[in-house]
């Protein structure tokens, strides 16, 4: 999708030394996937087909979200799923291509919207942790939505949220151990409470720098 933000990011990436640019407009013909494979990790992006682009159209925000490629990062027998703004339309397409597999960590689609992270999607991948990136204030969409959080809670998936926990770092070490660290204190039950129906003037601290980081640590030797 064309945007000024994407154009600026792409130009910045081109200026990085030794940076290989891989575009999802030219995926593998057999799998329609982008595979980046190194000796220590494997990253697979499941991209929409050209026919999907042609038939689906991009005339609404929902349709634009439905072309988000979903990626799975594999490292030391651990799997982390990255979903962008994926929703109920492209989640089934990815499930059909991966089959039923276990994934350890989910970056929840579309900031925890109720149109993403549906029951059949969660049951297909058996996640243990869920990471939600959402604003701490000025959140007019009330993300994450309660319906989404209820689905995660029903499966006892530990939820981490940038609005409650600040910066979140997910690390996988050389032995495959997962460690999640947060800028602010983590409260399991508090993170199951959504913003649906709450007034927009919340008593939360706005932090525009809140981010989620995924780190593989073998190269650092610990």
Regions from the PLM with identified roles:
Residues 1-222:
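Non-globular, low-confidence helical/coil segments that flank catalytic cores
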């Amino acid at each position: 999708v064309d945007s000024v933000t994407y154009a600026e990011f792409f130009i910045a990436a081109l200026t990085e030394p030794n940076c290989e640019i891989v575009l999802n407009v030219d995926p593998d013909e057999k799998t329609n996937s982008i595979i980046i494979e190194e000796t220590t990790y494997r990253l697979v992006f499941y991209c929409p087909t050209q026919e999907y682009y042609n038939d689906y159209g991009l005339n609404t925000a929902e349709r634009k979200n439905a072309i988000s490629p979903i990626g799975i990062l594999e490292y030391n027998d651990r799997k982390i799923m990255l979903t962008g703004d994926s929703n109920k339309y492209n989640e089934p397409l990815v499930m059909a291509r991966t089959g039923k597999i276990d994934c350890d960590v989910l970056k929840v689609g579309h900031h925890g919207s109720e149109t993403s992270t549906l029951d059949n999607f969660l049951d297909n991948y058996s996640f243990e942790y869920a990471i939600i990136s959402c604003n701490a204030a000025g959140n007019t969409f009330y993300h994450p939505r309660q319906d989404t959080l209820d689905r995660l809670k029903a499966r006892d998936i530990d939820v981490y949220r940038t609005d409650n926990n600040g910066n979140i770092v997910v690390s996988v070490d050389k032995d495959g151990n997962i460690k999640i660290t947060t800028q602010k204190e983590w409260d399991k039950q508090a993170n199951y409470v959504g913003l649906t129906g709450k007034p927009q003037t919340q008593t939360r601290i706005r932090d525009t720098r809140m981010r989620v980081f995924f780190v593989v640590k073998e190269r650092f030797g610990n």
